[in-house]
Every structure is written in structure tokens, then in C-alpha cells.
Amino acid sequence: MEKKVQIAVYENENFKRVAEIVKKKSIATVCEEALCPNIMECWGSGTATFMIMGSICTRGCRFCYVLKGKPSPLDDEEPKRVAEAVKEMELDYVVITSVDRDDLSDGGAQHFANVVKTVKELNPGIIVEVLTPDFRGNIDAVKKVIDAGVDVFAHNVETVRRLTPIVRDPRASYEQSLNVLKYAENVIKKSSILLGLGETWDEIVETMRDLRSVGVSILVLSQYMRPSRKQLEVKKRYTLEEFKELEEIAYSMGFSAVISLPLARTSYKAKEAYFRAIENAKNHS
């Protein structure tokens, strides 16, 4: 019998506190903008993923709910507001992501770096994970973000090679994403694959193998869920048993940490995955 996936929906004091801080600081979160199914769990445990550089994306990937259009100019006060919010939430691990900003010459890399540096300065000892766009393949932009003091660098390949032109914006490419990850050096690397878009089992395994070949050590596998009728239809719903089997295959390939669950998203259980990766790296060193 197929096991069902259940979502715990509740509000506690932590949830309310996080919501109040986010509103007070006028900060966008991917939790809200992308309709993440884990918002109750994550905010309820006092964690959030901050989305910088506005909430309007210059790209139109066909799986994504984030609004596409012409973004507003960058807010120079945003690094300070994010850093203060992190401090008020008393976080020791933070995830920072962004929309694509193809309208900016560096894709927003300098602003990303400014946010990371300010968060680190105001919150000594904090672990910072970033989930970045591809910066149009600009490796100098990637290095600029990493050099700001990033502990985990995440960039999502999103889907298998064959489906990339269908699923992602034309300005994205499978090889470009692999190159971004390949040249992200001296940092723990992470990527995610959405399942249920029409890929085959062999293509999933091939994509996992490609990610390992460019040094990715943390892998997230999740079920694609259609956020509205404007996005692509779900082609297949994977069972918990299939997610477990893929997790085992991933570990056999040498990934240090794998989050393989229907409701997983890149930042889901990010802190747990980070420490698991660190521990596994020590055990194999």
C-alpha cells in the first residue's frame, strides 16, 4: 500500500515571531513567494529563507510561481535589514536566495556578497548558505559571492538534461548550471532536482551522477507540485519508497548528505544536511 504524505499545519509562537520580524523588516522570503509547503514547519522552528533583490524575477521558468517582470532597483539598505532580522530571530544558520536579475551587469553578485558580509559581521559564528541563480554563467560573479564568506553554495540544476529547455527559462542551460557548480571552489556544494516533470528513472540517476562529477556533496530530491494552472502539469507522483531508493543510490555515489522526500525543497532541513555532510566528510578523510 502506498504511504501518504501529510503536512503538519499549525501556528506557534515561533511562527508568529518570524512572521512579525519578516513584516517589520520588509523582507521577502522564498517561503512565501514560492508557496513553499514547509512554511509552517520551518517558521514554526524559527528558521526562514530570505529572498533578496526583490520578489520579481527576470526569468520565467515554467515550474516556478515567483512573479516574472521588470524588477525594482536594488535596495542598498537590504543587507542591513536582513542581518538585523537574522539577529532578532537568533539564528545560527541562515539560507539566502534571490530571484534572477539579468538586468544587472553582474547578475546581482555584488549585492549578494554585501548581504552575506553584513550578515556575518552582525552575527559572528553564523553559518551562511546561499542558493544563487546562474549569473548567466559568469564564474567571476560566482567567486565574488563565495569569497564573501559563504559556507554552503547551492545552485539548482532543477531537472534532467533533456527537459531543461522545456522546464527552465531559455537563458538557463543544463551545462551552464553544471559549470557554475564546477567552478564554485573551496565551499560545500549543493543542488536540487525536482521530480515529476516527465523524466525517466535513468535520467534522474544520470543527473545525480553529473552533479557528483562537479563536486556536489549535498543533494535534495523533491516532488514537483504544480503551484497554479499557469505552470507545467505534474507528470508523475513518486512514492516514498521510490524517494528512499533514490536516496540510497545517491549515497552509493558518494553524496555526503541527501534529503529525498516529496515535500523537500532546497533549504528544507538545510542545517541538518550541512552538519551531516561535515560529519561524513570527516569520516571519509
Swiss-Prot record:
Chief location of this protein within or outside the cell: cytoplasm
UniProt binding sites for [4Fe-4S] cluster 2: C57, C61, C64
Listed GO CC annotations: cytoplasm
Q: Impact of mutating S267 to A/C?
A: Loss of activity. Does not produce lipoyl product
UniProt keywords (A-Z) are: 4Fe-4S, Cytoplasm, Iron, Iron-sulfur, Metal-binding, S-adenosyl-L-methionine, Transferase
Lineage top rank: taxon: Archaea
- At the top of the EC hierarchy, this enzyme's class is transferase
Thermal characteristics: Optimum temperature is 60 degrees Celsius.
Q: Which family does it belong to?
A: Belongs to the radical SAM superfamily. Lipoyl synthase family.
HAMAP family tied to this protein: Lipoyl_synth
Q: What is this protein called?
A: Lipoyl synthase
The taxonomic lineage of its organism, from the top, reads: Archaea, Thermoproteota, Thermoprotei, Sulfolobales, Sulfolobaceae
Q: Which gene encodes it?
A: lipA
